[in-house]
């Protein structure tokens, strides 16, 4: 199982890097999604869900549909969420890209919040404590977290397996 997860994780990592190369102004979002999903399939995995590319005020989970005319903007905040699976073992990861200097600090805040979460996560730590680290980091950059998005547990064949990690110190998520 661990070997498969590492292999699929490598596919997701490479797929995200590939997606970053494709994110250019005026490129159709659907085209990027289709190319990234084809990349995943070409690397002996299957998409765990449709590639999500969310722009600006759309915080997450935007899925381009056939005929979608949405283009990557010249300036903006682009979030790319990719998941792949093999034999039901799922890996899910996302990255935030700043297009233009206006959004650079927000993208840095997102990355720093992820690093704070990873540095806080240890055996015995409660989910709310990770959320506290995330919220403090984001607020240090002058932003507020999105309260209705969370990290989530993944199980075999199950992308959202119940256990969540909030972006703020929600003690009900312990």
Task: Annotate each predicted stretch with a short phrase.
Residues 1-174:
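Active-site neighborhoods and metal-handling regions in enzymes and metal-associated proteins
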């Amino acid at each position: 199982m661990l070997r498969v997860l590492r292999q699929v994780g490598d596919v997701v990592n490479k797929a995200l890097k590939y997606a970053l190369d494709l994110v250019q102004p005026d490129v159709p979002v659907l085209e990027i999604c289709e190319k990234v999903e084809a990349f995943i399939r070409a690397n002996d995995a299957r998409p765990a869900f449709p590639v999500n590319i969310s722009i600006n005020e759309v915080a997450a989970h935007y899925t381009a549909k056939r005929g979608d005319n949405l283009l990557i903007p010249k300036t903006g905040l682009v979030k790319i969420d990719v998941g792949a699976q093999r034999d039901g073992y799922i890996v899910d990861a996302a990255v935030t890209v700043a297009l233009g200097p206006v959004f650079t600090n927000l993208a840095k805040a997102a990355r720093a919040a992820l690093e704070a979460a990873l540095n806080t996560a240890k055996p015995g730590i409660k989910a709310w404590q990770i959320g506290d680290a995330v919220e403090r980091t984001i607020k240090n950059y002058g932003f507020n977290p999105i309260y209705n998005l969370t990290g989530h547990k993944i199980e075999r064949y199950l992308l959202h397996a119940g256990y969540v990690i909030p972006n703020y110190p929600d003690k009900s998520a312990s």
